[in-house]
A protein has these predicted regions:
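A short, well-structured juxtamembrane/interface segment
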Residues: 1-4
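S-adenosylmethionine/decaboxylated-SAM
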Residues: 6, 10-182
Length: 182
């Protein structure tokens, strides 16, 4: 993620980053650290309920809701303030986009969106909200694409794979990257 942040920030300086499904802040810390090294002023929006998985539904074979609730906003804030020391972040506590999207300025453009929500409906809602706010060349990273417990996310990515305005690739770590072409 650090290299991806560097590449996108180089092409689109100042483009914001959105992470939905922050859990304990590990990926947020990596991205913030990279932005700090780059002396960027991009805003990182970190959206999480801090109460576990939300919107689990019939397209998800493993999750029923509430899993991964062993976190808190304070854990994430401590990590960002003491480890990455990157000041330009905003925590959006609640279900995104339903409860917290209004906290993002309407003209904000994103270079990266990291979706780590584990379930179909939540991932779809985030993708549909962010796509028109993504810069050309921007990337949506689906953290859970290749995991047997996240079949809903795999299904979602496959549904969007052949749209002409994007390219989808995946790696051996289970991530899918959806790159906006136009």
């Amino acid at each position: 993620m650090g290299r991806l942040v560097g590449k996108v920030n180089n092409e689109h300086p100042g483009a914001a980053i959105l992470e939905v499904g922050v859990w304990r802040g590990g990926t947020a810390g990596i991205m913030a650290q990279q932005l700090s090294v780059l002396k960027s002023n991009a805003t990182i929006y970190l959206a999480d309920t801090f109460t576990g998985v939300a919107k689990a539904g019939e397209k998800d074979n493993f999750y029923s809701g509430g899993e991964h609730n062993d976190t808190s906003q304070q854990i994430v804030e401590d990590l960002l303030q003491h480890k990455s020391q990157y000041p330009n972040y905003k925590i959006l506590k609640g279900i995104f986009p339903d409860e917290t999207a209004h906290l993002v300025p309407p003209n904000e453009m994103f270079g990266i969106c990291h979706i780590d929500v584990d379930v179909y409906d939540s991932a779809k809602d985030v993708l549909e909200w962010v796509w028109n706010k993504l810069v050309t060349g921007g990337v949506v990273v689906f953290d859970d694409y290749g995991f047997h417990s996240c079949t809903g996310v795999t299904r979602l990515v496959e549904e969007y794979r052949n749209y002409p305005d994007r390219m989808v690739i995946h790696n051996l770590n289970g991530h899918a990257l959806m790159i906006k072409l136009k």
